[in-house]
């Protein structure tokens, strides 16, 4: 299957999601928030959180494309599905599966800034620790990783493996 090792098992996934949930509920207590998921990878993470958020929210999505079948970004990211709610004057909770180079997130952050969002908080399931191409701040991450190619729990290779209930190190040469 190409998975060399499991680095975040199902119990760790649950614990990470629960910790993120607690952090978000404390941070956004008493606020009305637009929860903005970045498709497609956010689905498992956001799915674990959404029904247990204790603050008032509107749910929205944005999709950014920059990978085309490979394991590395191949072109400048672009918005391929825009959000439907107006972020002007609103608090935004941005949910992402992984922050890697930062280029895709920077595009979304710039869009929200241009549209005059009141505040933007970025919560990522995994944050890569390698130097980023874009200068962005992750406000909360469940897990940190150096620079391994990961699949599972929303992370994919050519559209596959997002459904795995764990996160594994992937070797595309062994697929």
Curated annotation (Swiss-Prot):
Q: List the disulfide bonds.
A: none
Q: Which cofactor does it need?
A: Mg(2+)
Name the chemical reaction catalysed here: IMP + diphosphate = hypoxanthine + 5-phospho-alpha-D-ribose 1-diphosphate; GMP + diphosphate = guanine + 5-phospho-alpha-D-ribose 1-diphosphate
Tell me, in one coarse class, where this protein mainly resides. Answer: cytoplasm
Q: Which UniProt keywords apply?
A: Cytoplasm, Glycosyltransferase, Magnesium, Metal-binding, Nucleotide-binding, Purine salvage, Transferase
Q: Which GO terms describe its cellular component?
A: cytosol
**Record-annotated residues binding Mg(2+)?**
96-97
GO:BP terms for this protein? Answer: GMP salvage; guanine salvage; hypoxanthine metabolic process; IMP salvage; purine ribonucleoside salvage
GTP-binding in keyword set: no
Q: The organism sits in which domain of life? A: Bacteria
* Cellular compartment(s): Cytoplasm
Q: Name one GO molecular function term.
A: nucleotide binding
User: What NCBIfam families does the record point to?
Assistant: HGPRTase
Instruction: State what protein this is by name.
Output: Hypoxanthine-guanine phosphoribosyltransferase
The organism of origin for this protein: Mycoplasma pneumoniae (strain ATCC 29342 / M129 / Subtype 1)
